[in-house]
């Protein structure tokens, strides 16, 4: 009330106020009775138009707006700051996991093409390079001995034996990119996601990628033609167990046949929603 009165009288006194604007109304001593909620505007064909008895005042001109702005500043006794009102976004860690063949790499590749400011961590592996794979892009291909040295030196945030081969996440890569303000994307198998949950807790976002059905997943893996039938059997049997661990994740995204774009969009929506959170996750690696 006091502020309103100060404001009204300061506005009335202010030489900056445009003359054409009506003088500020007196503040009533007692608060007015609550008004009924405003009715929604309805179409002109219906009988529900809500007419105000007075026409709205004409919009102020550019100069008037400027004067009003300065008048408000004078009334409050401070200038209006142009500093952002929302806190700056913090770099975040996104963990994308799911059964083998579900499309993790495919989704990540599209995300990489779509979004800037994200770093997709290249993990290290002792597995042999597949045709078409590039060292430093798909993986850092190292020998088993080199991998064991990385473990010894505590260079890996997480590592695991995946289908008989070592896979692990270089810590320094995450630190370097987070320091530059990048968001981090990690692609791991389900056991890797469980380990990362223990290390990172709620500070990272965990997304479980699934196919629309087991049948679709198996067909996708067969179609990829990267595994022998024995290896396929292991991956498919593992996938059956892995789907049961969905509850440890924050989000589930369905990557259905022929709709890779839909899955990518959904992951993007998750990122956007997380960025808009008031209470943000803070990461410390
Ligand atoms: N929505 C989709 N519809 C059809 N095919 C897809 C879709 N998403 C991915 N694929 C294809 O499915 C195969 C498996 O995808 P991808 O290699 O990305 O899986 P992954 O989860 O990374 O597997 P892994 O864990 O074994 O590395 C690839 O041939 C890919 O092109
Ligand atoms: N736990 C970890 N899993 C990883 C890591 N890097 C990749 N992966 C996962 O391994 C499987 C098999 O990969 P493939 O290239 O041999 O088909 C797949 O699910 C990857 O996501 C890692 O650093 N840690």
From Swiss-Prot:
Biased composition (Low complexity): 1-19, 40-50
Predominant subcellular localization, coarse grouping: plastid
Binding site for ATP: 98-105, 255
Disruption outcome: No visible phenotype under normal growth conditions at the permissive temperature of 30 degrees Celsius, but mutant seedlings develop chlorotic leaves with aberrant chloroplasts under the restrictive temperature of 20 degrees Celsius.
Cross-referenced InterPro entries: GK/Ca_channel_bsu, Guanylate_kin-like_dom, Guanylate_kinase, Guanylate_kinase_CS, P-loop_NTPase
Keyword ATP-binding: yes
Region (Disordered): 1-66
Record-linked Pfam families: Guanylate_kin (PF00625)
Domain of life: Eukaryota
GO process terms (BP): regulation of developmental growth
PROSITE patterns from the UniProt entry: GUANYLATE_KINASE_1, GUANYLATE_KINASE_2
Transit peptide: 1-42
Cited function: Essential for recycling GMP and indirectly, cGMP. Essential for chloroplast differentiation at early stage of leaf development. May not be involved in the synthesis and maintenance of the organellar DNA during leaf development.
Protein name: Guanylate kinase 2, chloroplastic/mitochondrial
Source species of the chain: Oryza sativa subsp. japonica (Rice)
Taxon lineage: Eukaryota, Viridiplantae, Streptophyta, Embryophyta, Tracheophyta
């Amino acid at each position: 009330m006091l502020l309103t009165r100060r404001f009204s009288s300061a506005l009335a006194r202010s030489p900056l106020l445009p003359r054409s604007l009506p003088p500020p109304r007196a503040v009533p001593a007692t608060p007015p009775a609550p008004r009924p909620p405003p009715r929604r505007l309805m179409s002109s064909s219906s009988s529900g138009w809500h007419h105000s008895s007075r026409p709205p005042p004409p919009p102020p001109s550019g100069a008037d707006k400027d004067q009003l702005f300065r008048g408000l500043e004078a009334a409050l006794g401070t200038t209006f700051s142009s500093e952002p009102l929302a806190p700056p976004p913090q770099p975040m860690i996104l963990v994308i996991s799911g059964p083998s063949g579900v499309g993790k790499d495919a989704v990540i590749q599209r995300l990489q093409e779509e979004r800037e400011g994200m770093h997709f961590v290249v993990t290290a592996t002792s597995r042999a390079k597949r045709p078409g794979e590039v060292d430093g892009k798909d993986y850092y291909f190292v020998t088993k001995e080199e991998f064991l040295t990385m473990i010894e030196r505590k260079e890996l945030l997480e590592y695991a034996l995946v289908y008989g081969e070592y896979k692990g996440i270089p810590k320094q890569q995450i630190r370097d990119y987070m320091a530059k303000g990048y968001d981090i994307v990690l692609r791991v198998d389900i056991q890797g996601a469980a380990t990362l949950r223990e290390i990172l807790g709620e500070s990272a976002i965990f997304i479980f990628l699934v196919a629309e059905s087991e049948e679709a997943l198996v067909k996708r893996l067969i179609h990829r033609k990267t595994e022998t039938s024995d290896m396929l059997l292991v991956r498919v049997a593992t996938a059956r167990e892995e789907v049961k661990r969905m509850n440890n994740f924050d989000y589930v995204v369905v990557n259905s046949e022929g709709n890779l774009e839909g899955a990518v969009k959904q992951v993007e929506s998750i990122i956007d929603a997380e960025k808009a959170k008031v209470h943000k996750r803070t990461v410390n690696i």
